[in-house]
Amino acid sequence: MSAPLSVAPRSAGTGRARGQRLVVGALVAALVLLLGAGWLLWDNRRLVVTEQAVEVAAIPEGGLRIAHVSDLHAADHGDFLDRLAAEIEQRDVDLVALTGDLIDMRTADLGSVLDLAEHLSAVAPTFFVLGNHEGDSALREELLAGLEDAGVTILRDEATSLEIRGTEVTVAGLEDRRVAVVDGRTPAQPAAVLDRLALESAPGPTVLLAHRPEFLAQYADHGADVVLSGHAHGGQVRLPLIGPLFAPHQGWLPALTEGVHRQGDTAMVIR
């Protein structure tokens, strides 16, 4: 004969404790999410200016001060763009470099970006190259026309020069290679364009605006003294102690995400 099955009722106290743990866990998770969202909102709106000195040959007397702005993605966060323009105006720069992704494919209004461009071009000669997000935007041509009206020099796989304190400085610009390929104009690799620009033959220092940093070796092989890039966002995924975990077009554990990098006589500054 089998033993009788005994079923004891669950303690009401045990059920309440489990329910309380679930509630506390949900509250903690919600708090973490709120704090994370708040930090991201604050981080996207804060303005941090990083000054970096780069040694190159044949620079103008007193050096060459460049304001480098990249990957704003139409960041009209309150007065952020106004503060950015005011900060650059105070810096007594020789030129301004806009290295792409001023807008993205979601941008619906160019007003704040074009106001910024007009302000900057009144401060110093201002140059712009297309990033990948402008290539995907339906407002690309409107943006280019607006930048020209604002006094910005647009460099689409071309170079120009200007004199700064008696020294001729060549400023060249490569638009994002994806834009060029979609337009059916140039190959995906920048080497062919750089061959045509012949920066190594320039009489003075050369500054190359190029949205994507992963082509550093090609930029260096073609005589660029200073390269200004963006695109990598400091690593779109970063981990404490490890640093950048992932960046677009570089993949996992990317090497070129921010700061100054050197190859031969070429210095690249990534924003």
Language-model region placement:
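Short, Asp-centered acidic motifs that coordinate Mg2+ and/or phosphate
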Residues: 94-95, 127, 152-153, 169, ...
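Membrane-embedded segments
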Residues: 62-158
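N-terminal membrane-anchoring alpha-helices
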Residues: 1-58
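Short, flexible loop segments at the rims of nucleotide/cofactor-binding pockets, characterized by
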Residues: 44, 72-77, 103-107, 182-186, ...
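Beta-strand-turn-beta hairpins that frame and shape the catalytic cleft
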Residues: 53-67, 152-153, 159-173, 203-205, ...
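Conserved beta-sheet core of the metallophosphoesterase superfamily
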Residues: 212-271
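Binuclear metal-dependent hydrolase catalytic cores centered on His/Asp/Glu-rich metal-binding motifs
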Residues: 145-152, 164-209, 216-217
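Extended recognition/assembly regions associated with phosphoester-bond processing machinery
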Residues: 45, 50-56, 196-209, 213, ...
